[in-house]
Curated annotation (Swiss-Prot):
GO terms for biological process: double-strand break repair via homologous recombination. Residues 987-1006, 1160-1218 are annotated as: Disordered. Coiled coil: none annotated. Belongs to the helicase family. AddB/RexB type 1 subfamily. The lineage of its organism: Bacteria, Bacillati, Bacillota, Clostridia, Eubacteriales. The keyword Hydrolase applies. This is ATP-dependent helicase/deoxyribonuclease subunit B. Despite having conserved helicase domains, this subunit does not have helicase activity. Keywords: 4Fe-4S, ATP-binding, DNA damage, DNA repair, DNA-binding, Exonuclease, Helicase, Hydrolase, Iron, Iron-sulfur, Metal-binding, Nuclease, Nucleotide-binding. Residues 1160-1169 have a biased composition (Polar residues). The heterodimer acts as both an ATP-dependent DNA helicase and an ATP-dependent, dual-direction single-stranded exonuclease. Recognizes the chi site generating a DNA molecule suitable for the initiation of homologous recombination. The AddB subunit has 5' -> 3' nuclease activity but not helicase activity. It holds the Pfam family ADDB_N. It comes from Desulfitobacterium hafniense (strain DSM 10664 / DCB-2). ATP binds at G6, R7, A8, G9, T10, G11, K12, S13. Residues 1-279 form the UvrD-like helicase ATP-binding domain.
């Protein structure tokens, strides 16, 4: 055995290649010359040998890793015929073992189903095998704490069970080197071979076992080790400070010497003391003295006569992106000015996952060819998504979510548009499960105009069903046959047949060719490899568990465990690329220029890992019992120092070390100790700060990478800033290159364009809305909030995707419908609201709610147990509302006149009509939930109720700005149609009267007045009490908790007619002083103030109508305090409102106090609003019959007609137009 020993850069690998070259030249047809290197370095070493101008080829030379060496041995002497269960297969087997033996475990029982547990156990068992620890050794541990003993016994059990599962039909790759070592003596190609072992700093016990076996067959084994020769010459038993980085190579050297002596092999040394790699004095000094103590300062640090004597530069950066941008600019500068090839440069970091995404984005933008040296996880590949979602679809009986995940993988022969339309249809009508199966066509669209679209959807459904149903039938368990009877092999076969039916291999080949044609060679490699990798996983599943009967949930869990760990290793697809890798896994042994990224504390050096089944203390205890495992703790610290040493000594000519000063959130980051050490060794070390806002012409990146910064500077220009001379020149250059950079035209267009909408042409606005503008309160309120939102919803008629779920509007509709039908039932039975007991009212609510529940959202309330329980809660909520309304009836004399009465053209009540300019007019329509009336003396008073499924408040401030006009508009409509209401309802004849008043005999002589308008919340309040409440008191308190909100007439007699106990009113929210006066802040208005409100309504309707017909669609959302129109707006992705743009500004609405409100309303430029505004047309018998029909004097038919969207769930207005 011969050792080549030397520090970094002394030429160990070069000497190995030279010796191989010399041997092959002297004996061209001799025995194999084997170069044994780490797995990740095989491709690089093959390239080095092949491109060596002196080698003349590598006919005798073979570059092998230990794994490839095993394949060669098995191919010559046999023993490799068993199916290989790889890492993915082992994790699947272990997941199954955990599920099967959970009851036999104590330590690992609770975490048996935890994600990642199978990974930890697989790593532990692999470590046992690599370090040649047997289950019996684990069981033989004594005199340890109970937890450690239990843990080792359970691991020994799982270890043995895994070996049993593999059986005689399969083998574990972790066992291969042990098998290889036993067969090396029979391998002809190793008899008398010369072997060079290069690139290792240490070996596992299995690898040492293989080397020991080769000592008996090889003519000579040469091992190169990164070790200071002085350490061997001195023979010192302990390491001095700074020498710990050679800890592992020295331990390895000692182990190899022991093997050689045991084999009675001769031992010789080649000590390399001269460094040949470094072309800069600074790099040479860094290698020799980085770990030397006391510190050896670079003697030529201030020598200004030599051009760049150091070859080292520091790049502090604002953040990670600025750091990577700066590295990319420097790479392009090196290529442009110094003629560097891309392969001359490497980028390494200790935190590759943290930098990978940024590197990909930035290097692609700069058009820098690169290769990321890491294994790619493929769990998010469409093929893996297809496998997992297909199984879940069967498992969950064709549920929507997994089924459409499956369909969106692009493997089904349906366009994305067809899949999207199908998804919208299924979401809207809650289609899942059995609805997909059979030959019954879907016909959920009620509109016959959709027949053609329905036919297309059924065609798509049939294609999907024909492809997927055989898979469903093949793997679905059959309980009628005595339980699940499907084996793993059968499920796997069904999966394979599904993949073939969907032509997955052909799709993958197309994707690979497309990636190749656009120059993405790494992506092409991945698409070419993914099919074989997935089939390998399925083969391993069958090899390990093929005949085992398994239910789908366990199968899915095991397959997911395997696919989550599936990773693909790619070889560099091109020759001239920048190599990007991790500090502990880089293929490039040396490079001309190296960029070391992320030199921050906690990253460089990395923190020792404590992941695994055993913690550091347990490992030490096992070591004391003779169980030697992978080094941890202090040894990991030494290993981190070695990684830093190799990174700092890899560059021949130039070393750049960069580090961000802040993280993504602007928090400061600490610099690595490596930086402090470098500054001690090189006091004059140059630094260059990297920023995203670069103004130096010499540092300009590739034009494509400049485009984001170009857009940023154009944005600043748009906001009024000026461009620097440099960016003026850049802009002129881009404007001259628009053919090559089409994005420039879009960016420049963005500079000129304004994110604003002007006005629609008036003819178009009139065509869109009509000469007689028929509208609703909800539409005008939306227009008041934001004209563009109104245009999007009612002009463009955009709507959100329908979803089969019970939304707040659905619950509001349910409440309205039940309350309406409950009132009709009372009227038919001649009952008053306050007459029924609690039990009687609950029975009547049940009777009226059941048929309504059948019609809501395609019977959604009956679709599952959750919704059936929710139905009960909704009934309970309505029942409480009924009890509160009954209390109103008991306490007052106001009677329900009409229910859900509509006003508008051709409706029971006439519309509110406002003349507009140019002969146009606005007609307001809507539907009033409930109109109550009372006759007091010779006066008739009307009160409006509007049901809300939430707490609702109305204020004069909201009314002034048009944000809440519903109650006011309804009151105005009721007063305009009052004569129709009174004559059709028989109010005068049926009035209960009030104290001190008698019913009127002639309503024609009565004057009709507003009594108020109120929001009634349909809610079931939850009470808090520190004492136990009896049922009767609880019922009273819950009724008191429901507060109506609105404004009432400031007339004591009228208020007494609403609540006899006015002084202690719990129903109206009115507070009185001791003298009987109304307290300040009570929600009361005089009749003159009600008239002013109606005047303001007319003014607002006129202004809104004029603005609508003038085509106002401006993006001007309101803002008042913390509230804006954008908070819950669905159209934000459409309008792109940005308050930072100069043309995008909120309409700031001032908060109008009550006193100011009345001042403003009185001064509005409008004709005096008459106390009794006449109806638009004289009501005739037709209007009265319509009111009787629509007002609800007869029960509803079997089909429930759902209305608009006026409230969150209780919309009542038809928002069409004439």
């Amino acid at each position: 055995m011969r050792f080549i020993v030397g520090r970094a850069g002394t030429g160990k690998s070069t000497l190995c290649r030279q010796e191989i070259h010399k041997e092959s030249q002297e004996h061209p047809e001799g025995l194999p010359l084997i170069l044994l290197v780490p797995e990740q370095a095989t491709h690089q070493m093959e390239m080095s040998l092949a491109h060596d101008p002196q080698s003349g080829g590598i006919l005798r030379a073979q570059v092998l890793s230990f794994r490839r060496l095993g394949w060669r041995v098995f191919s010559e002497v046999g023993g490799g015929g068993k199916a290989v269960i790889g890492e993915v297969g082992k994790r699947m087997l272990l997941r199954r073992l955990l599920l099967n033996h959970r009851s036999d475990l104590r330590v690992f029982a609770r975490s048996a189903t935890r994600p990642g547990m199978a990974d930890l156990l697989a790593q532990a068992i692999a470590e046992f095998k690599i370090y040649r620890i047997t289950p019996d050794q684990l069981r033989g541990i004594e005199d340890a704490d109970e937890l450690l003993l239990q843990k080792t016994h359970e691991l020994a059990f799982l270890y043995e069970e895994l070996n049993k599962s593999l059986g005689t039909a399969a083998r574990d790759p972790d066992d291969e080197l042990n098998l290889v070592a036993g067969k090396i003596s029979q391998a002809p190609f190793l008899q008398g071979a010369k072997i060079w072992v290069d690139g290792f700093k240490g070996f596992t016990p299995q690898e040492l076992y293989v080397i020991q076996a080769m000592l008996g067959t090889a003519a000579e084994i040469t091992v190169s080790l990164p070790l200071d020769p002085e350490l061997l010459k001195a023979g010192t038993p302990r390491f001095k400070p700074g020498e710990e980085l050679f800890y592992e190579p020295r331990q390895t050297y000692q182990g190899l010497v022991d093997l050689a002596r045991e084999a009675k092999a001769s031992i010789s040394h080649v000590f390399l003391t001269e460094t040949h790699r470094f072309e800069k004095a600074g790099l040479k000094h860094l290698e020799r003295f980085y770990n030397a103590y006391p510190t050896q300062t670079f003697p030529g640090g201030d020598d200004s006569t030599a051009p760049d004597p150091l070859g080292i530069a520091l790049f502090p950066a604002a953040n990670k992106r600025a750091e990577v941008e700066g590295v990319a600019r420097e790479l392009r500068r090196l290529a442009r000015e110094e003629g560097r090839t891309w392969r001359d440069c490497s980028v390494v970091t200790r935190d590759l996952p943290g930098y990978q995404g940024i590197i990909e984005q930035v290097f692609n933008a700069h058009e820098i060819p690169y290769f990321l040296d890491h294994k790619r996880p493929v769990i998010h590949h469409p093929l893996l998504e297809l496998l997992l979602s297909a199984i879940e679809t069967v498992q969950k009986d064709w549920a929507y979510e997994p089924l459409f995940r499956c369909l969106k993988t692009d493997f089904f022969p349906c366009s994305k548009d067809r899949i999207d339309r199908l998804e919208n249809y299924c979401l809207a009508y809650g289609i899942h499960g059995s609805a997909w199966k059979g030959n019954r066509s879907w016909s959920y669209y009620p509109d016959p105009n959709h027949k053609e679209e329905t036919a297309g959807l059924n065609e798509t459904r049939q294609i999907i069903y024909d492809l997927f149903s055989p898979f469903d039938q093949a793997i679905r368990p059959h309980p009628e046959a005595g339980g699940p009877s499907v084996t793993v092999a059968q499920i796997t076969e069904a999966i394979y047949e599904l993949l073939i039916r969907l032509k997955v291999p052909e799709h993958l080949q197309e994707w690979a060719e497309a990636a190749h044609s656009r120059g993405d060679l790494a992506e092409a490699q991945l698409q070419n490899q993914i099919w074989d990798a997935v089939i390998q996983v399925l083969d391993e599943l069958v090899a390990g568990l093929g005949e085992e009967v398994m239910d789908l949930s366990d199968f899915a869990m095991i397959l997911t465990s395997g696919l989550e760990n599936l990773q693909l290793g790619l070889i560099p697809p091109g020759y001239d690329q920048v190599l990007v890798g991790s500090l502990d896994r880089s293929r490039n042994p040396e490079t001309a220029v190296l960029f070391l990224l992320g030199a921050n504390d906690g990253i460089l050096p990395g923190k020792p890992s404590d992941e695994g089944v055993f913690d550091e203390l347990e490992r030490l205890r096992l070591e004391s019992k003779g169980i030697m495992l992978a080094p941890k703790g202090k040894v990991q610290v030494y290993e981190e120092q070695y990684f830093i040493y190799t990174a700092l000594t890899r560059a021949r000519e130039q070393l750049y070390i960069s580090y961000p000063l802040t993280d993504e959130e602007g928090r400061g980051l600490t610099v690595s100790p490596v930086i402090h050490r470098l500054k001690m060794i090189f006091p004059g070390l140059p630094e260059k700060y990297l920023s995203l806002d670069e103004e130096e012409p010499g540092a300009l990146p590739h034009p494509y990478a400049l485009l984001p910064a170009y857009a940023l500077h154009l944005q600043k220009l748009r906001q009024g800033s000026s461009l620097s001379p440099l960016w003026q020149a850049i802009r002129l250059w881009f404007l001259s290159q628009t053919a090559a950079f089409p994005q420039v035209q879009l960016l420049e267009k963005g500079l000129r364009d304004q994110n604003e909408e002007g006005k629609l042409p008036q003819p178009l606005a009139r065509q869109l809305y009509g000469k007689r503008l028929v509208t609703s309160v909800s539409r005008l309120e939306l227009f008041a909030r934001c004209p563009f939102a109104h245009f999007a919803q009612y002009g463009l008629k955009l709507k959100e995707r329908s979803n089969y779920r019970l939304s707040p509007p659905d619950m509001g509709q349910f409440f309205h419908a039940v309350l309406h039908d409950y009132a009709i039932a009372l009227r038919e039975r001649g009952l008053d609201w306050g007459e029924l007991s609690k039990e009687q009212s609950w029975q009547l609510v049940n009777e009226t709610a059941e048929p309504i529940a059948l019609q809501l959202q395609n019977k959604i309330l009956l679709s599952n147990a959750r919704y059936r329980y929710l139905t009960h809660k909704l009934k309970r909520t309505v029942h409480h509302a009924v009890r509160v309304l009954g209390e109103h009836a008991r306490q007052g004399v106001f009677l329900p006149m009409e229910l859900e009465v509509k006003f508008g053209p051709q409706e029971a009540l006439p519309p509110l009509e406002v003349p507009l300019s140019g002969g146009n007019s606005l007609l307001l329509r809507g539907q009033i939930d409930r109109i109550d009336g009372a006759v007091l003396g010779h006066e008739i008073y009307l009160r409006i109720f509007d049901y809300k499924s939430r707490e609702a408040h109305v204020s004069l401030n909201q009314i002034y700005h048009g944000l809440d006009l519903q109650l006011l508009a309804y009151l105005d409509a009721a007063l305009q149609g009052a004569q129709i209401l009174v004559s059709s309802s028989g109010l005068a004849e049926g009035s209960k009267g009030s104290e001190g008043s008698e019913g009127s005999e002639d309503s024609e002589d009565s004057t009709i007045h507003p009594a108020g308008f109120l929001y009634f919340p349909v809610l079931e309040p939850q009470l808090k009490s520190k004492t136990l409440l009896y049922p009767e008191q609880l019922e009273k308190d819950r009724i008191k908790a429901v507060k109506v909100k609105g404004y009432l007439l400031a007339d004591r007699q009228v208020l007494l007619a609403m609540d006899r106990d006015l002084e202690n009113s719990s129903l109206l929210g009115i507070k009185l002083t001791k003298s009987g006066e109304f307290k300040k802040g009570s929600p009361i208005l005089t009749e003159e103030q009600f008239a002013l409100l109606r005047k303001h309504l007319q003014h607002f309707l006129r202004c809104s109508g004029e603005a609508l017909l003038e085509g106002d669609i401006s993006i001007t959302p309101y803002r008042q305090g913390k509230h804006t129109a954008c908070q819950f707006c669905s159209y934000k992705p459409l309008c792109h409102f940005d308050p930072y743009l100069p043309e995008n500004n909120y309409r700031n609405l001032p908060v109008i106090q009550d006193e100011e409100f009345w001042q403003r309303v009185q001064s509005q430029d409008s004709e005096q609003y008459p106390e009794q505004h006449p109806p638009t047309s004289v009501p005739g018998e037709t209007s009265r019959r319509a009111l009787q029909k629509d007002g609800g004097n007869s029960p509803r038919g079997q089909e429930l007609i759902w209305l608009g969207e006026d409230e969150a769930g209780a919309g009542k207005e038809d928002d069409g137009h004439e």
